[in-house]
């Protein structure tokens, strides 16, 4: 079931459908931000990372037409700032999807990412009919952990060696929300300052387990 990809805005932040003509800008941002993004990038354990941006965008668009994803470009004051992808969309009895994102280093600290995530999550809940939205984050990715803390995504557990990132299988913390928790929406709750403080709290046992896994994976 294909869902039309909207253009959504709040203040200086816009998320819109990614387009083939974004390929050159997307490639430039990824290359210019290699040091900033490489350690968080999903990688293919069976092949090299591809920088064929047009092919990547076509794949995202085909996935969207099949009803499995919503690929967005993120803009700040009209300037290309990053990407947000809603993926693994499942309808019916599960009604679930996953969010992934990145922004260029020069845009960090401007609340662009939480705003983009809130816009996308509210759309998925209230327009696309999703019931549950999930974000999985590497334990050492402090800026991304701050995003789920700001928006009140609930911590749901540690997933061991879950996604291949930067050349190896990495542990991830899992956070989620369900639509019943948010009658006013994610963005409004954040802007109103009513996000529960403890939602994103990670149990100490999981912090220790992730830390041990990281040391073992680094050969320490």
PLM regions: where:
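Residues that form generic nucleotide/phosphate-binding pockets
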Residues: 29, 40, 56-59, 63, ...
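Conserved GNAT-fold acetyl-CoA-binding loop/helix
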Residues: 38-58
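A short helix-loop-beta-strand connector motif used in the catalytic cores of GNAT acetyltransferases and
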Residues: 45-47, 58-73
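Short, charged low-complexity intrinsically disordered segments located at boundaries
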Residues: 52-63, 87-91, 152
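Acyl-donor (CoA/ACP) binding surface of acyl/acetyltransferases
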Residues: 1-25, 29-36, 71-220
């Amino acid at each position: 079931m294909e869902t039309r990809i909207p253009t959504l805005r709040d203040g200086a932040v816009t998320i819109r459908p990614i387009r083939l003509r974004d390929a050159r800008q997307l490639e430039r941002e990824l290359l210019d931000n290699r040091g900033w993004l490489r350690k968080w990038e999903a990688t293919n354990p069976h092949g090299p990372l591809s920088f064929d941006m047009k092919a990547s965008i076509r794949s995202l668009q085909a996935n969207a037409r099949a009803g499995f994803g919503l690929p967005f470009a993120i803009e700040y004051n009209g300037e290309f700032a990053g990407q947000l992808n809603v993926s693994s969309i499942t309808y019916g009895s599960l009604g679930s999807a996953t969010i992934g994102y990145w922004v260029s280093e020069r845009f960090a600290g401007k609340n662009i990412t939480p705003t983009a995530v809130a816009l996308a999550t509210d759309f998925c809940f209230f327009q696309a009919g999703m019931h549950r939205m999930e974000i999985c984050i590497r334990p050492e990715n402090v800026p991304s952990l701050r995003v789920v803390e700001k928006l009140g995504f609930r911590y749901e557990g540690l997933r061991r060696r879950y996604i291949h990132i930067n050349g190896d299988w990495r542990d991830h913390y899992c956070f989620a929300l369900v639509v019943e928790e948010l009658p006013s929406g994610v963005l409004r709750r954040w802007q109103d300052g009513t996000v529960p403080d403890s939602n994103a709290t990670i149990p100490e046992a999981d912090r220790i387990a992730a830390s041990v896994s990281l040391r073992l994976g680094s050969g320490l």
